[in-house]
Amino acid sequence: MTHFLRSDKKPEGHKLEDLLVQLRADIIHRCDVIAGDTRPEALQVMANNMKILCHLSDAITLALDSTRILDRSFGPSQAAQGGPPRIGKTDAA
């Protein structure tokens, strides 16, 4: 069973790209808070956050691409209504 992502056992779960976009927004907010701090620690944290943001943006692009592939090949997901997965097996109990 998934903790956050939508599945046949968790129809109220989230789409991966939605979680990644939310996480990216949170990190951008955190960056805004520390942007004026010029201490070495803050500068390093900001540099780390910028790298993380790049990786998150790449992950969002990949997640959106996967959704487009599945939508094009199998139609819209019915997971939110408790439908079966479009690929793979159903979740084990």
Residue ranges and their predicted role:
Residues 1-4, 76, 80-93:
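Short intrinsically disordered terminal tails
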Residues 2, 20, 26, 47, ...:
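General helical secondary-structure elements
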